[in-house]
Structure formats: C-alpha cells, structure tokens
C-alpha cells in the first residue's frame, strides 16, 4: 500500500519477491518495533499467488505521529502470468508482462512497458505512461500527464487535469477535461474533451472530435472527419 512496486516478466515459472522495509522515526527503538511488526505475506491461491503487506494497527496510526514507513517491492513473475496490483503512495513500474495486466495506483507514477494482453490501468495524482502493448488497453488517470504509445488494439483512455499525448493506437476512444490532447498516427479515433486544445495528425480511418472551450487542429485524416467545438477555432 505504501511504497514503490517494480514488476518484471521473466522466462520460466518462478515467482521471486524482494521486499525492502523502510521506517523513519525520531525514536530508534520505535522505528525498529514498527519495522518488525510489518508482515510480508506470500500465499498460493486457486489462480496463482498473492503478495500482501500487512501493517500494524492501533497506536501506530492513531496515537503516534512520528513514524513514516514504506515497503518497496521488486517482483519477478513468469512473463506469461496475469498480474493484478493495488497500491497507494508510491510509484509502480511494470515491464514485459505478457499475460494481461491490471494495476490500480494512487499518489505516484504508473509506468507500463512492453506488455501483451489486456491492460487495465488506473492512477491518480501522478503521471501515467503506457509504452507498447500488444492488446487492448483501458486507461484512466487524473491529476497528471498521460503518455501512451504503440497500442496494438483498442485503446479506451480517460484523463483529467494533465496533458495527454497518444501515438500509434490501433483504435482510440478518449474522453477527458481540463487538458491539452495530442493524437498522432492512429487508427479510427474519437476524442471528447473540454477546456484544452486538441491536435490530431495522421488518422487512418474516421475521426470524431468534440471539444468545448478549446481549439481543434486536425490533418491527415483518411476517412470522414466530424469536428465540433465551441468558443475556439477549428482548423482542418
């Protein structure tokens, strides 16, 4: 829940988990007791394996204000395994996962590279990057930039309050607000947003854009183009 998580897909069938516990306190004994109370649990399930962090309860959270803590994970998983992650207050990085990926994170950067299968990503209060996915992707971010490239499948993306850059998606459906949106070298695309600019270049198929209170610039569309806006120019 609190700490950075790094996941790597590797050949073979072995799961390897490295966990690093970090505790800071004005009292050394208190820090050591708290660290000793953190449990790293690894268990088998019907569908695979589960890794979970358990933190101590009671006075540590309600009576003491001097302890800060995190558990950082470096996890190697069989590259064909599906992965599900839930984290708070830390960065999450996933690379070379080929069995589908589901990640929910908050208050940190989320980066996924070189995946295959369906990717479901959700983040808040941090940047989100998806670079290379051989499959569909469903991506949601808030309060941070979104950068997506090389999605060989349908991309459904949502973002608020951060710049959005999307390149080379096989098919795109984007919705958002309060953000500048840039789309390039995509298949059929739909963009719905407000209070930001929309720039689209090179669409191999139809393009539909709805932008309120922001300009629209589009070029290189091979199919039909439907561009709707208000209170700002449209350039095509």
Model-derived regions: residue spans:
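Short, intrinsically disordered, charge-balanced linker/junction segments flanking boundaries
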Residues: 1, 228, 233-236
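Acidic (Asp/Glu) and glycine-rich low-complexity loops/linkers
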Residues: 4-87, 91-141, 145-159, 163-176, ...
């Amino acid at each position: 829940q609190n700490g950075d998580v790094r996941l790597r897909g590797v050949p073979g069938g072995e799961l390897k988990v490295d966990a690093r516990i970090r505790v800071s306190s004005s009292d050394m004994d208190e820090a050591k007791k708290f660290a000793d109370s953190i449990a790293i649990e690894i268990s088998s399930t019907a569908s695979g394996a589960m890794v979970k962090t358990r933190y101590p309860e009671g006075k540590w959270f309600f009576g003491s204000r001097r302890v800060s803590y995190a558990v950082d994970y470096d996890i190697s998983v069989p590259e064909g395994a599906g992965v599900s992650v839930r984290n708070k207050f830390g960065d999450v990085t996933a690379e070379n996962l080929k069995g589908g990926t589901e990640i929910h994170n908050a208050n940190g950067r989320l980066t996924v590279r070189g995946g295959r299968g369906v990717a479901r990503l959700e983040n808040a209060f941090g940047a989100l990057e998806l670079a290379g996915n051989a499959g569909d992707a469903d991506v949601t971010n808030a309060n941070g930039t979104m950068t997506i490239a090389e999605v060989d499948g349908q991309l459904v993306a949502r973002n608020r309050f951060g710049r959005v850059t999307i390149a080379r998606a096989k098919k795109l459906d984007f919705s958002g607000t309060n953000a500048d949106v840039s789309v390039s070298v995509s298949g059929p695309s739909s963009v719905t947003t407000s209070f930001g600019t929309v720039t689209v270049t090179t669409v191999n198929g139809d393009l539909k854009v709805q932008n309120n209170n922001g300009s629209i610039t589009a070029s290189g569309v091979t199919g039909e183009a439907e561009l709707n806006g208000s209170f700002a120019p449209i350039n095509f």
